[in-house]
């Protein structure tokens, strides 16, 4: 029963389980390792699986977003692991501490499962988790967040603008996977990131007004977690806590944010725009 439920919630990046403590209830390195493998698989662009099935595995492995995602996870894992070992906040041994760091680095942009209570981790490790919530997984995956590809395009745009200031007469093309990114695609990415920033900032103001007893960690992490479909947040709403203490209006608004995050912001904004329905009618 447990294996069926956790298999389905892992592949769909759902993150809920059969007990309140979730994955922590098993306290098993083997179970966590198996789940980690499948969480990584769900955070990869699903179109790459078609390449593997078509016998084009080498081409799939050269995908820059895939490499970028794996590199981000690797750096986050090592950074948090080093920070946890150095800080001494955990009573776990070295290997167990590194295991928890790896599990959380992967799960925070996927299922949101927790193998330990990371709300007790040092500020640096929690900040890394917050960044992972924002970045998320690959485009075309079941993971959440802004997506690695969009972050990559934004980085390439910033790099191009710096180079254009240095060499104003030079024509500089932006490329991902050797393909030139046209301006329309760049504007879509910028529109998505801008919409995310506006919605997140306004939501933080709104929720901080609704919940005056919250601190900055609570407000920031709850909004980011909701938009990224992460599940747990930081602070008072970490992996061992529930959101039942929130006001009805806060729960309603965070549910709206989860809906926005799951369906993609621009898609929902287009759907809600009156002109869309006017053209249909």
List the model feature ranges, each with a label:
Residues 1-281:
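Membrane-proximal intracellular helices of multi-pass ion channels
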């Amino acid at each position: 029963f447990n294996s069926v439920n956790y298999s389905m919630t892992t592949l769909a990046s759902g993150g809920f389980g059969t007990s309140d403590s979730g994955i922590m209830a098993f306290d098993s390195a083997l179970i966590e390792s198996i789940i980690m493998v499948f969480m990584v698989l769900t955070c990869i662009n699903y179109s790459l699986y078609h390449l593997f099935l078509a016998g084009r595995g080498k081409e799939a492995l050269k995908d820059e977003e895939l490499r970028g995602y794996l590199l981000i996870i690797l750096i986050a894992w090592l950074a948090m692991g080093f920070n946890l070992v150095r800080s001494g906040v955990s009573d776990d041994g070295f290997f167990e501490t590194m295991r928890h760091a790896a599990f959380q680095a992967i799960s925070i942009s996927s299922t949101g499962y927790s193998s330990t209570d990371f709300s007790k981790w040092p500020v640096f490790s929690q900040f890394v988790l917050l960044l992972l919530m924002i970045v998320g997984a690959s485009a075309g995956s079941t993971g959440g967040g802004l997506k690695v590809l969009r972050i990559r395009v934004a980085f390439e745009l910033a790099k191009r603008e710096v180079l254009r200031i240095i060499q104003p007469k030079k024509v500089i093309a932006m490329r991902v996977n050797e393909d030139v990114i046209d301006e329309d695609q760049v504007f879509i990415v910028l529109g998505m990131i801008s919409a995310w920033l506006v919605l997140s900032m306004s939501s933080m103001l709104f929720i901080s007004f609704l919940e005056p007893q919250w601190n900055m960690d609570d407000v920031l992490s709850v909004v980011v977690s909701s938009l990224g479909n992460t599940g747990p947040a930081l602070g008072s709403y970490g992996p061992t806590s529930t959101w039942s203490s929130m006001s009805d209006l806060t729960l309603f608004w965070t549910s709206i944010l989860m809906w926005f995050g799951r369906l993609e912001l621009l898609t929902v904004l287009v759907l809600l725009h009156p002109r869309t329905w006017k053209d249909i009618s």
